[in-house]
Amino acid sequence: MNINEKTRKALLRFQQNEITESLLYAQLAAIEKDPSNKEVLLQIANDEKGHYTILKKYTGQEISPNKLRITKYYWLARILGITFAIKLMEGSEESA
C-alpha cells in the first residue's frame, strides 16, 4: 500500500498510542483486585493490541510504546486509583 508521508506519520502516531495503551491496560489489570474489572481491562488491552496490529499492516513498521506515558499513568493509578487514571487517559486521548 502506498501512502503519503504525512498520513504515514499520523498512522505511526496512532500505532504508538495503541501499543502504549495496550501495555498500560494490561498493567492496570495486573493491579486490579476485582476479577470482573480485571477481565474488562484485559479485554481492552487485547483490543488495543489488535488496533496496533492493523495499523502495523499499513505502516509496515514496528514501533515502541511510550514508556514514560505508561509509567506516568501506572503511578497515577496506584496513587489516585485506576478509575481516575483511566478518565485522565481518556481525556488526553480525546484532545489528541
Language-model-detected regions and their locations in the chain:
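Non-heme di-metal
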Residues: 1-96
